């Protein structure tokens, strides 16, 4: 896995990471768009401003359990890493992201050029203004 060096250490190691993986697993499909992820977990309400998590972020799992996210920027950083993995290797195996609970199933996150630019801007803002974020 291309992102293996970072995943679980610097990225992918939070409660929000586990919630994101549960969400991706629950979608039961190989390909999911970034637009769909944003809509289903509530990130679209933040209008690409992830400094403060002012809106509820979460989803209703197919098993009936409400799963929430604490910090939008955690989810964005994790999604960015998964997007990078998908760019390099076309897919990512959920089991590689969580070897304890995730099934061995490939997924791919698809993003438009505009969405990728917006992700870049959000990550750049985070690196330049980390104390502005609610972590």
Language-model segments: residues:
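Short amphipathic alpha-helical segments and their helix-coil junctions
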Residues: 29-68
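Context-gated lysine
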Residues: 5, 29, 40, 45, ...
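N-terminal leader/targeting peptides and immediately adjacent processing regions
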Residues: 1-40
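Domain-length accessory/inserted modules outside core catalytic folds
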Residues: 39-42, 46-49, 55, 115-135
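Generic preference for flexible, low-structure residues
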Residues: 23, 50, 54, 89, ...
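Amphipathic protein-protein interaction modules
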Residues: 66-132
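Sequence-level detector for tyrosine residue identity
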Residues: 2, 6, 10, 56, ...
């Amino acid at each position: 896995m291309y992102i293996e060096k970072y995943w679980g250490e610097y990225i992918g190691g939070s409660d929000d990471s586990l919630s994101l993986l549960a969400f991706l697993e629950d979608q039961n499909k190989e390909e999911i768009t970034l637009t769909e992820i944003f809509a289903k977990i509530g990130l679209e309400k933040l209008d690409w401003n992830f400094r403060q998590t002012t809106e509820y972020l979460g989803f209703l799992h197919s098993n009936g359990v409400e799963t929430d996210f604490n910090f939008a920027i955690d989810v964005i950083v994790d999604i960015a890493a998964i997007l990078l993995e998908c760019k390099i290797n076309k897919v990512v195996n959920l089991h590689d992201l969580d070897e304890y609970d995730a099934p061995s199933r490939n997924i791919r996150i698809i993003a438009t050029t505009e969405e990728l630019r917006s992700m870049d801007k959000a990550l750049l803002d985070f690196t330049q203004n980390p104390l502005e974020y609610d972590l």
